[in-house]
Amino acid sequence: MLFKKFTWVIPSLFLTIISTSLLISCATKSDNTLIFNISLDHNADTSIEKFFTVFSKKLSGKLNKKINVNFNIVDDSFTKINNIQANKADFAFVNSQAIASNNWFGYTPLIQTLTTAFKEDLELDYYEDGNLQKKAEKTNLLFLSPPYKEWDDIKQKWTGNRYDFLYEPSKLVSFYRSMILITGSASEITAIKKAWNEKNWNQFMKFGIGHGQTNSASRFELPDLLFRKHFAKNYPGLQNAINSDPDKFAVVRGREIGINKNIKIVFDDANSFSWTQNIKGSKRPFYTPIDPNDRLEILTYSDPLLYDIGIVSNNLSRIYQKAIGEIFIELAQSSEDLYGPSIGYNGYKMINDFEKEVVEIIEKTYGK
């Protein structure tokens, strides 16, 4: 099967650091009690409790029987999958990397999460389409004028979660990307772009590269995959390059670009500045080089990776599975979804053709 081509090592540490209470259902499993494993970007509060109260009521109505939906907070996608396979949970949202690396037994990919599209990234296109740098150039016009350190909550439409001026509110997409940020003097920027356009990996690397942990999709994996396509045989792979020339690499977040003068290229989530509030009066504004003469811009974006996927236990009947997916969609459409928007889910869609809607997209990004 396709997913056997993806090799992942799941550290045993996951099983020891996750509290036992997160691995065991919070109620005795029965036909009328379902357990959802969820992630939160904030502490569980009354809004989350209310969400599951509403969800339980709607599910009970669809199935014409009393159903209670309880939840556990579990952040790791592999643990969520294991819980469903072990019959300790019935539903969970997991990242697409975990789906790609799993044997896909005991559960069904049910719904695809969606998020509001960025203005200049509305289509699911790839490196070979030749549009990734064009997207970056168009986004730079929004990102850099005015520069981030001058962004204002009112002018740039800060909502409390994001800067709305960067988004296309009427468009939902199922994917995200990594971005490659570059900084330096005018001559350095020109030289970095020259090395990129000439596909000269050795020259490109000399400018210093900031990356994330090896298990980070946006800050390690997606840039690595992009470089494999772009630099081709001249590229040894990101980890091999780090091992060979460690002085040319460092762990750096995108918002910290320009602090380390030896690092001119940094990987980050695409448009991470869109949800990072500019703190007026800060002595060290994010996305702002220390040297006032240095510039900053997005060089390019990576290929896409799918947003989180809702998976459901195969121990549930198809009627149960379908009802769960429909309720998520209905709550989002009626603006009653108190959970999804808190972690970036602005909508959902049923997965009708797993091979086409999930497998083919993953294959195209990872390479067949």
UniProtKB/Swiss-Prot annotation:
The keyword Transport applies. PROSITE patterns: PROKAR_LIPOPROTEIN. Keywords: Cell membrane, Lipoprotein, Membrane, Palmitate, Signal, Transport. It comes from Mycoplasma genitalium (strain ATCC 33530 / DSM 19775 / NCTC 10195 / G37) (Mycoplasmoides genitalium). P37 is part of a high-affinity transport system. This is High affinity transport system protein p37. The gene is p37. GO terms for cellular component: plasma membrane. Its main location: membrane.
